[in-house]
Swiss-Prot record:
Matches recorded under Pfam families: AICARFT_IMPCHas, MGS
GO biological process: 'de novo' IMP biosynthetic process
Reaction(s) catalysed by this chain's protein: (6R)-10-formyltetrahydrofolate + 5-amino-1-(5-phospho-beta-D-ribosyl)imidazole-4-carboxamide = 5-formamido-1-(5-phospho-D-ribosyl)imidazole-4-carboxamide + (6S)-5,6,7,8-tetrahydrofolate; IMP + H2O = 5-formamido-1-(5-phospho-D-ribosyl)imidazole-4-carboxamide
Family statement: Belongs to the PurH family.
Keyword GTP-binding among record annotations: no
Entry's free-text remark on domains: The IMP cyclohydrolase activity resides in the N-terminal region.
InterPro entries: AICAR_Tfase_dup_dom_sf (IPR024051), Cytidine_deaminase-like (IPR016193), MGS-like_dom (IPR011607), MGS-like_dom_sf (IPR036914), PurH-like (IPR002695)
The keyword tRNA-binding is annotated on this UniProt entry: no
The protein, known as: Bifunctional purine biosynthesis protein PurH
Annotated metabolic or biological route of this protein: Purine metabolism; IMP biosynthesis via de novo pathway; 5-formamido-1-(5-phospho-D-ribosyl)imidazole-4-carboxamide from 5-amino-1-(5-phospho-D-ribosyl)imidazole-4-carboxamide (10-formyl THF route): step 1/1; Purine metabolism; IMP biosynthesis via de novo pathway; IMP from 5-formamido-1-(5-phospho-D-ribosyl)imidazole-4-carboxamide: step 1/1
Source organism (scientific name): Pseudomonas putida (strain ATCC 47054 / DSM 6125 / CFBP 8728 / NCIMB 11950 / KT2440)
Source taxon at top rank: Bacteria
Keywords (A to Z) from UniProt: Hydrolase, Multifunctional enzyme, Purine biosynthesis, Transferase
Gene Ontology cellular component terms for the protein in this record: cytosol
Amino acid sequence: MTDQTTRLPVRRALISVSDKTGILEFARELQQLGVEILSTGGTYKLLKDNGVNAVEVADYTGFAEMMDGRVKTLHPKIHGGILGRRGTDDAIMNEHGIKPIDLVAVNLYPFEATISKPGCDLPTAIENIDIGGPTMVRSAAKNHKDVAIVVNASDYAGIVEGLKAGGLTYAQRFDLMLKAFEHTAAYDGMIANYMGTIDQAKDTLSTEARSEFPRTFNSQFVKAQEMRYGENPHQSAAFYVEAKKGEASISTAVQLQGKELSFNNVADTDAALECVKSFVKPACVIVKHANPCGVAVVPEDEGGIRKAYDLAYATDTESAFGGIIAFNRELDGETAKAIVDRQFVEVIIAPKISQAARDVVAAKQNVRLLECGEWPAERAAGWDFKRVNGGLLVQSRDIGMITADDLKIVTKRAPTEQEIHDLVFAWKVAKFVKSNAIVYAKQRQTIGVGAGQMSRVNSARIAAIKAEHAGLQVQGAVMASDAFFPFRDGIDNAAKVGISAVIQPGGSMRDAEVIAAADEAGIAMVFTGMRHFRH
């Protein structure tokens, strides 16, 4: 067993970085500690111009950089110094004038930034594939018993602190080694993803005619939390987040109080937050088992999130018990008090949590309180994954949205202005309800949600039952369906309960029959041309 605590000093370091964040300060600290520094190209020039003594790698190896910098560190005096096993390879190193290198600070050519630039072509991308850097990183990581490898600027301070204490422990070097292999794995995966989208039969030099999906799919996720169990107690689980952080989400949220998030908490909170992001005006979404059971939107001058919570809760008070509550505005103390006084809640999430709200919720220590930050108005593109036995389904995120201008009126009666507001509202909610999904809404409040039924008409019946159970009036409400109606029975059922307008994608072979049913009942109906299945 390797001694985890014995400290090894650093006498010689090699520094060659593309991202120069913090490198001057780091090099100065090393110099003050008596560490000899080897460096290359732009890094060497930066150090020299700022008074840091360094030896250029070409002077040390006696071999000048060549091929426009493609070959500069690929030399036995570099890799021998990194890979040489202390106490085993000393004689051969001395024979060839190879000096041991105890620390390697390297980060790689900015391949991702390069290919993200408009008009980037294949030759440009290829020139930004680092060869010497990953080779040094892997060499140092392999020999982590004797060498420290640092690829993240965030580790510089900890390394300096360790050196001032007498050297780096094996535990520190092991952690740095793991980060290094994670770094090169992500880098190579990024290159493979990029190259894997090129259709060689069309044009190997063009970045325009690309497949959306690479030949192999490489993505890196970092473990954020090990959980007590998974969806069920007999399943083990962990929560992994994308290495590169994106917009505000459950993955970026900060937990301010409460018990540790469970597997189901994370899944349900994600559903609630993504739904509430759909709304511009103050909104509240309550979710249970990944389905919205109550949603409401209330303008600021009519009560804002405080009133929105009341209306969302009123949709289905039974299902709201033990649910997840999400807001798209800062959570204030009054709204927080209304929640904790009224119901048992697992998680509350909002872009910001006021101090007053924190003080209120602090009395309920088991309530998980999350602050996720603001999100942009325009949703970021990305990927959704669904694991199947032996495979992975990958699709672009469903960020499709519609406005009133996108609606196609297909019935004799056009919807009123208020009905249009309610139709768009209900449509946004239906997108986040498990298919088959039916949403009844009135005055931008859900009054009944029918979720996850194999028959669309049964989802409609459930929505009506929910509304009746909650004591909410269906007469004059609108109905949203996440997919088309295959038969007229869904419209006939809506007419019986008093639905006044319907929003659906359209596209059924029996659209004419469905439209006729709406006309017979005096129901206004609009098509979106966009489906929102959710499984």
